[in-house]
């Protein structure tokens, strides 16, 4: 009799979108300044920019039925389905350096990016 052993990896699959602690902390600070606990950060992709697509950020109170919602340290990040397809595997971060402070999206799907960092193509 032959025994077959199968190994199953029970770890959760990687998140399709990474929302860093640094980004969540900055959003939490901005929300405190706004004084509206119902606000969430919405990230989106739209046509435009010098490379074809550009990223956008806005605060939104409404969560649409088809939104992807990520919770991080009490902050919600919203992404609509059209934008999500361009952001799968991306990291949304906040950085402060000599060039200034800004939200940054590191997107493995972008084949080219603009020098400004807010425009890309796939």
Curated annotation (Swiss-Prot):
Iron-sulfur cluster binds at residues 50, 114, 116. Binds 1 iron-sulfur cluster per subunit. Pfam families: Fe-S_biosyn. Signal peptide: none annotated. GO terms for molecular function: 2 iron, 2 sulfur cluster binding; 4 iron, 4 sulfur cluster binding; iron ion binding. The keyword Secreted does not apply. Belongs to the HesB/IscA family. PROSITE patterns: HESB. Homodimer. The keyword Iron-sulfur applies. One of its GO terms (biological process) is iron-sulfur cluster assembly. Required for insertion of 4Fe-4S clusters. It comes from Bordetella petrii (strain ATCC BAA-461 / DSM 12804 / CCUG 43448). InterPro entries: FeS_biogenesis, FeS_cluster_insertion, FeS_cluster_insertion_CS, FeS_cluster_insertion_RrpA, HesB-like_dom_sf. Its cofactor is iron-sulfur cluster. This is Putative iron-sulfur cluster insertion protein ErpA. Keywords: Iron, Iron-sulfur, Metal-binding.
């Amino acid at each position: 009799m032959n025994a077959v052993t199968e190994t199953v990896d029970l770890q959760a699959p990687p998140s399709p979108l990474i929302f860093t602690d640094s980004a969540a902390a900055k959003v939490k600070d901005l929300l405190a300044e706004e004084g509206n606990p119902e606000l969430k950060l919405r990230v989106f992709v739209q046509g435009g920019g010098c490379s074809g697509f550009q990223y956008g950020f806005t605060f939104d109170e409404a969560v649409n039925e088809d939104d992807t919602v990520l919770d991080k340290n009490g902050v919600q990040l919203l992404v609509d389905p059209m934008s999500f397809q361009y952001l799968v595997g991306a990291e949304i971060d906040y950085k402060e350096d000599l060039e200034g402070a800004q939200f940054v999206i590191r997107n493995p799907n972008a084949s080219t990016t603009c020098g400004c960092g807010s425009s890309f193509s796939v």
